[in-house]
Amino acid sequence: MQQALFGGGCFWCVEAVFLQIRGVEKVTSGYAGGHTTHPTYEQVCQGDTQHAEVVLIDFDEQQVTYSQLLDVFFATHDPTTLNRQGNDIGTQYRSVIYYFNEEQKQAAEHTIQTLKDDDLDIVTELSPAPTFYPAEDYHQNYYEKNPSQGYCNFAIPPKLLKLYSKFQHLMKDQ
């Protein structure tokens, strides 16, 4: 089993996307990249911890590759806006890839360069994986548990539509 660690705005949205991908065994919402140990959601939202909202993805590389996960990541959030995803503004919503090994770093660098070659101004941070802190239990599988919640209804369906239209070949059998 391999792991990927991505931040692309609100972790509820990113989690909802990656739970649809074949070979993804588990997605854990959490925090990484800051200076506070065991931060709370409230602390991260205040912006003082410097943590990003991230998802830790456990995946089977025999079913989905890290590069394919990168493609999904970049297609389902805005990697060109610094510290912002839609109406969510703050460093906790930054676009970030934390890599666990040199192969992941190189794959991410290649994907970012390909997007830049297409004239996209990518602001995604690329850094070694720091300590990951799981978010509080009520954040886990949030969209699955709260599909009619207002924010979720606004932010997540457009991401899922993009996912379904561009990555049908990577979707879990329903």
From Swiss-Prot:
GO terms for biological process: protein modification process. It is an enzyme of class 1 (oxidoreductase). One of its GO terms (molecular function) is L-methionine:thioredoxin-disulfide S-oxidoreductase activity. InterPro entries: Met_Sox_Rdtase_MsrA_dom (IPR002569), Met_Sox_Rdtase_MsrA_sf (IPR036509). Keywords: Oxidoreductase. Its EC number is 1.8.4.11. Gene3D superfamilies: Peptide methionine sulphoxide reductase MsrA. The active site is at C10. Belongs to the MsrA Met sulfoxide reductase family. This is Peptide methionine sulfoxide reductase MsrA.
